[in-house]
Amino acid sequence: MSEPSQAQGTPLVTPRSRRKVIAIGIAFVVILVAVGATAVYYLTLPKPFGGSIKVGFTISLTGQYNIEGTNSRRGIETVANWINSHGGLTIQGKVYNVSLDYYDDQSLPGNVPNLYTRIIQQDNATFLLAPYSSPLTTAAAPAADQYDRVMISHGGSSDLIWTQTSRRNLVAVLSPASLYLKGAVDWLKANHPTDKIAALYAQDSFSTFATQSALGYAQSLGFSVVYNASYPTNAQDLSTQLTAAKNAGADDLIGGGHYTDGLLIMNQLKTTWNTPPPKFISLLVAVTEPAFQTQLGGTANNVTGPSQWETVVTYSPTLAQAAGLPWYGPSPSEFTQLYGTLNGGATPAYHAAEAGAALLVLAIAIEQANSFNTTAVRAKLGSMHVMNFFGEYQIDSRGLQIAHSMVLVQWQAGLKKVVLPPSVADGSCQYPYSGT
């Protein structure tokens, strides 16, 4: 027979010792939970706040460019709001908000140099945005190199700003002036290649370069240019020029300059070139602003104009991924909605979008460079190829934008339609212009 097993003897663990083991186990679990919670806390501890990054600029809130300037300011403020409400910028382990420091330049180039000196030397802005318009951007650009500050251009598109003078620290987010009227000429070539063209444009560098580039392109396609004239930027009466363009036998009119003179041209067409009016009209800048249609009513119908951006042109993270590009910032709909929230329900036109994109591109470069150093941020701006709500961003060695695409818009029955290119159009171009 076998001897009794150990189990039949005295228990190895008494009830009292069992309670001690359970208590120790519970305490150990509590310690593990506490240690784990502490680890999670430190791993997710909010980054320390580093302060604000001051971005300085002048903007035209009064004077000739007040419509474009005001909308540009609103676009910049919209993107600043988005950045700050989405965690700010992380540089070297610290979080920074964006603060804006700006002055009204009154649309006068002569005001710009001293204001930028003040922004840099007295207000201590670390980075700069350029003013609205090519003349004012030209006046501001020297400060960027003189004081070694990165400056992003959102409203100065004349190629001459970069091609006539080397600009070390000036970078553009918008397509250059030489491409503005190309879409209009392309449409005419495809649909009315025998039309005769008249050009009437403002004597500033942007308007001149944009229109002359279009005329050269049109002539290379076989068009006849029967009238080519410019006018002072402060012109109050263009009836003589419009009458001369009509008498030259022109079918179409291209040119203009900015918002104020765009309205002037359209209002004076009613009495100078109305029997019949031009068959096709494409004007710079003015046409894209909602106020253009509000002030002109039916006279705006069928007028076309180039645009850097419209709300119906939807860039997205999905599109960026398909193109092999990184995506940054709000979607077009998010930008549009936030802009409306901050501005009484207003819808942004391209001046707001390009100005907002300028701040966003600057923010991306600062964060990717992980530095406030001008050389580091400028180098990042030169190497980036990204997509945001405004479209693609990439520059050449001079700082000129080479990746962004433009569209052609036309007012139709009180609505602004994108008519070119076909891939993003929400309407087809209407011809001829009737004046009503």
Model features per residue range: what roles?
Residues 125-228, 275, 279-314:
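Extracytoplasmic ligand/sensor domains, especially the bilobed periplasmic-binding protein
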Residues 56-77, 103-109, 132-133, 200-208, ...:
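Extracytoplasmic "Venus flytrap"
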Residues 67-74, 89-164, 173, 231-238, ...:
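Beta-alpha junction/loop-to-helix N-cap segments that form part of ligand/metal-binding clefts
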Residues 1-49, 436:
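Secretory targeting signatures
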